[in-house]
């Protein structure tokens, strides 16, 4: 709206403002469209209801309007913004922006109509109270194929993961097109990490984790340890710094803001070893050994928040331990190894507590949504402790190997740097050291 007012007034120095707004609007439009489509999907029982029901027809009309908004925004982005240096083009921008605002008002009105209309999926009959709480029927007894190949859509994590993978691939392609090298191993690591996140949140394990403590712990260990390790080794911030174009003049673009963020006090706090240790490891106790766990499992928003906490806390921890991306205060390698071993010890104690527990974990949730094949809730909690104990060792061993390799390469780089320095100054540092030793020896003889 502000840009439309400036254009109507024919303020000439508005091109840069329009370019900045265009990038922000693109992100907002994408998120709005994806969230709206996902929200509409959950309210339809079958795809054909988008044409056969009043709710579906309203939804379809809103989608078409969003497509129209996207087309208008694309015209402004590709044909108008670059020519905003003249007042005549500013008037064209004002007219198109006014049309865009009109379409947006209609779309908002349709959104209000959708919010006050009853969707087709309003009453779904379930065989038990537990299934009605879940929102889906109990999954069958777990099998390898059911856990790995099963599917239950989680639009938030699926779309977010695909966007993250796409942005990384775009950055990689930009570097390659420019003739710059980027390790293929980092690309593979990032895509594998994204795949693990999608599997944890959209595959069969996501349904089973809501009815079984043991299988929940399997998903927890995977999204907290394996996925962050792979994502961190992808070095997304480093890729972004190399792929993004520097801003012109004194203005800040995405690359400059990212550089500021990586060296800001915010990142300094979130990458502090004490902070990441508390959030990543001790957070286990505050979540699983209190009523908070059962309460979060009983809330859809709470469950999503818990998964986000697992993923983000794991990412921050492994960024400090094995991260390639720059950060304000890198931890020395011996400190990284110590932090990792401390985390392993505290995590092992947590697993022992679960295995020695006399009562099932979160009975206020898992006791209600218990499927027929979970015959012993206490044994199920014991299985969760065994999973936490066993699976924590494999990622930890992998991370220890990575730290060892990084430490060795760091020593090699330091040795090479010293050799180059010696070649430049004739080994002045070593000669000064020998002279100092000779002076000390001469002092000892004279005394």
Sequence positions of predicted segments:
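Alpha-helical membrane segments of multi-pass proteins
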Residues: 1-447
């Amino acid at each position: 709206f502000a840009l439309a007012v400036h254009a109507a007034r024919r303020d000439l120095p508005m091109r840069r403002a329009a370019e900045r707004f265009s990038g922000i609007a693109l992100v907002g439009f994408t998120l709005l469209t994806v969230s709206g489509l996902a929200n509409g999907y959950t309210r339809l029982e079958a795809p054909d209801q988008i044409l056969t029901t009043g709710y579906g027809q309203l939804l379809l009309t809103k989608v078409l309007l969003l497509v129209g908004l996207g087309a208008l925004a694309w015209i402004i982005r590709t044909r108008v913004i670059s020519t905003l240096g003249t007042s005549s083009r500013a008037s064209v921008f004002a007219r198109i922006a006014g049309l865009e605002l009109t379409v947006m008002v209609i779309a908002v009105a349709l959104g209000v109509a959708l919010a006050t209309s009853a969707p087709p999926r309003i009453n779904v009959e379930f065989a038990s109270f537990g299934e009605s709480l879940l929102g889906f029927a109990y999954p069958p007894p777990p099998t390898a194929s059911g856990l790995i190949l099963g599917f239950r859509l989680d639009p938030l994590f699926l779309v977010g993961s695909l966007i993250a993978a796409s942005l990384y691939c775009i950055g990689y392609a930009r570097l390659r097109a420019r003739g710059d090298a980027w390790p293929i191993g980092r690309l593979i690591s990032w895509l594998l990490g994204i795949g693990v996140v999608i599997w944890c949140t959209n595959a069969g394990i996501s349904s089973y984790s809501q009815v079984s403590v043991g299988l929940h712990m399997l998903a927890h260990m995977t999204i907290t340890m394996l996925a962050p390790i792979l994502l961190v080794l992808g070095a997304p911030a480093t890729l972004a710094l190399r792929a993004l174009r520097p801003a012109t003049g004194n203005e800040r673009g995405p690359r400059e803001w990212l550089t500021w963020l990586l060296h800001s006090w915010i990142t300094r706090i979130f990458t502090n070893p004490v902070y990441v240790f508390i959030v990543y490891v001790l957070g286990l106790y505050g979540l699983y050994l209190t009523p908070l766990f059962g309460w979060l499992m009983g809330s859809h928003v709470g469950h999503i928040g818990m998964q986000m906490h697992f993923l983000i806390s794991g990412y921050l921890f492994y960024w400090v331990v094995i991260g390639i991306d720059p950060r304000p205060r890198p931890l020395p390698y011996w400190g990284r190894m110590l932090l990792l071993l401390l985390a392993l010890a505290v995590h092992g104690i947590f697993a022992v507590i679960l295995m020695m527990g006399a009562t099932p974990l979160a009975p206020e949730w898992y006791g209600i949504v218990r499927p027929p094949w979970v015959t012993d809730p206490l044994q199920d909690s014991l299985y969760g402790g065994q999973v936490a104990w066993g699976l924590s060792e494999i990622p930890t061993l992998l991370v220890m190997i990575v730290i060892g390799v990084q430490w060795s390469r760091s020593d090699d780089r330091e040795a090479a740097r010293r050799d180059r320095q010696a070649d430049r100054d004739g080994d002045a540092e070593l000669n000064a050291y020998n002279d100092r030793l000779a002076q000390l020896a001469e002092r000892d003889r004279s005394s």
